[in-house]
């Protein structure tokens, strides 16, 4: 998935995972996006440039 596809899916209320179902892309109150693990740890969806994903595009997928 591209960055735009990931953001659009999350904004539509769809569940987007990264690498495994244990990781989920979420949007925080300030409007940014992050990848959260079931354990509670999280990282930003992108690098500081706001464009480069923290992960490969093929690793992101919609929940079934």
Predicted regions and their residues:
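Mixed-charge, Lys/Arg-rich low-complexity intrinsically disordered regions
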Residues: 1-11
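Short beta-strand-centered aromatic/proline hotspots
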Residues: 22-32
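SH3/SH3-like beta-barrel fold
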Residues: 34-37
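Intrinsically disordered, low-complexity, charged/polar segments
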Residues: 41-64
